[in-house]
Amino acid sequence: MGGPTPQPMGEASGSVAPLLKEDGKAFKIAVLIPTINNADELDIVLGRLAKQSYSHFEVIISDSKSKDHTKDVCEKYGATWIEDPSRNRADACNFALRQMDHDLVLFTDDDTVPPLDWVEKLVRWFDNPEVGAVGGPNFAPDDDPFGAKCADVAFCTKFMTAGTRYGAQPKGELVPITHNPGVNCAHRMANLREVDFFEPGCIGAEDVVLDAKIQRAGHKLFIDPSNVMPHRRRRPFKPYMKQMRNYGYTRMVANKRWPEISAWSHTAIGFFPVIVVTALLAMLYGGLTGGADADLWFSLSGEWDISRVAFHIPLGLICIYIAISWLGAAIGTSPHRSIGTVFLAPLFVFLAQWAYGQGVIKAWREIRRTGGRAGEGAQIDDRIRTA
């Protein structure tokens, strides 16, 4: 996107001086947002970007052939609209990135509520040449419904999250990190070009793969724990579980190609649905064969035959699971912790792990079929894809 320098996006033009490069020229900055059929929420995002304290940036929308009024929303706020033929976030971003000539690229999604100092707080760190990329945490916005806040608490629980990075808030101003979610991050364009941008055809976990590529090239990633991006959570129950199935599926397939992003917990969670079904069948057997008799409750005395073991051991493990979920939610990082959301955390953690495990199982089948090649399969999501 050569040619004339774009007009500042923010209404408060000049409220913060532009960030300068070593040669004294201002960094050319863009916010890149991939979108599809989500014009109303995109309107909120662009409205917030139009009021940023740092106004020296361009907004670029990579639109995968939306059938709603997305283009009109872009024109309303003066954002650059690009019609993109792809069906996944990685390819949508790549399509735009290959046309851009900016120095810094900030990434977010079309369902966020950017704070009015979000751009300022991200770009300020790039006066340090050691910073290759920087990001921040993301939580559900305050106006999300109760169910979405329950999902946020489950995502940000201290335990039970299968290695996810939601809500990470390490201590310090700028902390080294191995991954920043693509909803709240900024990269140097030179580094993006060096690694040839996102992995083509990556149907999910594309931000994790990108960060792995950038670190392979020797560049450093950081997180600013104070720069929080409110990001809408999927509502229970179908959209929430569909998203979690997609996370499990796409992460495991990506892990096959990029071993350095793999964690043992990603594989372990694939056995969760099998363990749950086995435990319930054991309890059913134990209950039907006398293992749940009244005199066997709240006592360790007496004979522990197979019926008693089959009923009470799984029941005890369920109680421990609930207790760990409660504890993890209570000491987690979500700002939406309350008596209600913490109380329901075991349910939301269970649903997330069940769905994530289903996604992992689907990924195992995909890997056996294709070897986990990029561009194979299709993501599981709740968007209407018209590209």
Language-model regions: role of each:
Residues 105:
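Short aromatic/hydrophobic "clamp" motif used to bind/position activated sugar donors
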Residues 84-100, 171, 175:
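Glycine-rich, basic loop-to-helix element that forms the pyrophosphate-binding segment
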Residues 117-153, 228:
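Conserved donor NDP-sugar-binding/catalytic core segment of glycosyltransferases
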Residues 199-262:
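Catalytic donor/gating beta->alpha subdomain of glycosyltransferases that bind UDP-sugars
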Residues 136-142, 154-177, 257:
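Short, flexible, basic/aromatic active-site loop/helix in glycosyltransferases
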Residues 48, 55, 63-71, 112:
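A conserved acidic beta->alpha catalytic loop
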Residues 1-48:
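N-proximal low-complexity "stem/linker" segments adjacent to membrane-targeting elements
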Residues 272-369:
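Membrane-embedded multi-pass helical conduit in multi-pass membrane proteins
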